């Protein structure tokens, strides 16, 4: 099978390449695509060097499945066009709340995957949403979830490479007693917690919190009441979450542990 990755040189694109390298998926050809400034560069995949192609000149019919890992702007501009020639799996937020595009977490709602055929596009959920619904799904099946209160503690990798570099620089400057400047966050991130991710929207939530609330409803159950607080923490990679759940049916800790195990 032929696969392609749009945004192959970014954090998400490189991680996708890494996952495919370790996977058992039989790949005949892998096409790596990025902006013009990255075109011509090479990335090694399974012992071979693959040349980066220019998105503006790329032929989407090359691959059966194309991963979009370049953000919402690129998805908005190119994904629908690409879907005429290839199955699109988009990692950005652009299509997530589109009623005609399935929002898929394979461990949770794989049965909805068949709905991709209408537009030939599959949306991938937000990172913090994914780890929560994977844990909640089996509990919801057994006890019917009524309400969820979640607090997330999200690393700077979720904001991109520049914020990761800023954390390193700020940490070094802080320890050396130098003046700290912030370009990628509203406040200093080194040795600090920032209790909002992205811009504020209705009812005092941030966009990140809004995504968690509404994506979970679309994936799991629209009737679940959800409140979310998302915090950016001075950690390079990996997110963690604290989740309080209220069920419709009586539960006990032993049953929950058995189900999750």
Model-found features: residue ranges?
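N-terminal Rossmann-like NAD(P) cofactor-binding subdomain of oxidoreductases
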Residues: 1-189, 225, 249, 253-254, ...
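Oxyanion-binding "anion nests"
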Residues: 186-237
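C-terminal active-site/capping subdomain that shapes the small-molecule cofactor and substrate pocket
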Residues: 224-261
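Histidine (H) residue identity feature
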Residues: 140-142, 196, 239
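Generic solvent-exposed, charged/amphipathic alpha-helical segments
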Residues: 17, 213-217, 257, 261
């Amino acid at each position: 099978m032929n696969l392609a990755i749009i945004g192959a040189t970014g954090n998400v694109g490189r991680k996708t390449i890494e996952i495919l390298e370790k996977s058992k998926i039989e790949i005949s050809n892998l096409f790596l695509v990025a902006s013009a400034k990255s075109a011509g560069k090479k990335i090694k995949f399974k012992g071979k060097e693959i040349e980066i192609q220019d998105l503006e000149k790329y032929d989407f019919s090359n691959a059966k499945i194309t991963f979009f890992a370049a953000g919402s702007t690129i998805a908005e501009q190119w994904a629908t066009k690409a879907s005429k020639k290839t199955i699109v799996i988009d990692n950005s937020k652009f299509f997530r709340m589109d009623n005609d595009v399935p929002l898929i977490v394979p461990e949770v709602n794989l049965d909805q995957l068949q709905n991709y055929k209408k537009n030939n596009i599959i949306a991938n959920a937000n990172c913090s949403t994914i780890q929560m619904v994977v844990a909640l799904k089996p509990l919801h099946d057994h006890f019917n979830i009524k309400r969820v209160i979640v607090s997330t503690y999200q690393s700077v990798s979720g904001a991109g490479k520049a914020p990761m570099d800023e954390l390193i620089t700020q940490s070094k400057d802080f320890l050396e007693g130098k003046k700290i400047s912030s370009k990628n966050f509203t406040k200093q991130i080194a040795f600090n917690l920032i209790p909002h991710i992205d811009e504020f929207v209705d009812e005092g939530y941030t966009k990140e919190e809004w995504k968690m609330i509404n994506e979970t409803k679309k994936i799991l159950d629209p009737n679940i009441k959800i409140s979310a607080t998302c915090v950016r923490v001075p950690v390079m990679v990996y997110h963690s979450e604290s989740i309080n759940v209220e069920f419709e049916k009586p539960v006990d800790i032993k049953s929950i542990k058995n189900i999750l195990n």
